[in-house]
C-alpha cells in the first residue's frame, strides 16, 4: 500500500494503470485526484460478468450451455476478471436442466490452487458469507476436499430467487474465485428489473435465439448501459488482443469507462494528444510530414491512408 501510494503521488508519475480490488482502485483514484496536478487512474476493479440464459436457448441446448459455462467458471480457478459470477434465467424446467448439468460438472471438478493465500482466504470468506444468507442454497460444490494449507479452493454454484437477489446486496459483490450464483427469476419483467439495478461490469452475456433477441430487445438496451463488452452466445473468459476488443466498463468495473486495458487501443491510456498548427513541413515530427517515411496508417483530411500527403 505504501509503495502504491508513493508511486501515485510522485511528481514524475503522469498516469496510473491498476488491476485489483474496488477498494484498492478507488484509493489510488482518490490519491491521484488529490494531487496538486491530478493525473488519470485507469483502474480495473471488480466485475461479476452477468450471464442471461434466455428461454429459447435453454429449450434448445440447456445441457450444452452448462458444458460451456462450467469451464468458463473454473478457468484459472475462477481468478479471471471476466469470470461469470451471475447467471439469470426464468424459473422453469428448462433452467432446471441447466442447473442439473452444471451441478454434475462442478461436483466432478478438481480443486484448484489459487494465486496467494490472501486471495484464497478472501474467496472462502466471501463464499461462506453468501452461503449463510437466507434464501440462498448450494446447488453444487467440488466433491473433493481441499488443502487450505496449499491455498486450494472448491468451485461452488449457488441458487437463489430473483426476489432474494434484489434485496441482498451481498449477492452483487464479487467472490474472486470459482463461484457463481444462479438466479431464478419469476418473469421477464423481473429479469429486466434486475438488469436495470446492476452496477457496471466488464462484460454481459446473452444466450438466446434470434426470437429471444426480439422478445428481450429491452434487455439488450439495458445491458448496453451496464457493461463494456456485450456477448451473444459465447462466454466471457476469452479476451482477444485485437483492435475491436474493449476490456473496460462503467464504474465500479473501472474508473474510466472510455478506455480499454486489452487490445490495440489500450496504449491510448498513456498517450497525450498534441496538435501542430501552421508549422512548415520540415519542422513537424517525422510521422506528421507530407512524406510518409514510415509507411504508417494516418488520417489525412478525413481519409485513412498510408500514402504520402500532398
Language model segments and positions:
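NAD(P)-dependent aldehyde/semialdehyde dehydrogenase
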Residues: 89-202
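Extended hydrophobic packing segments that form well-structured cores
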Residues: 284-310
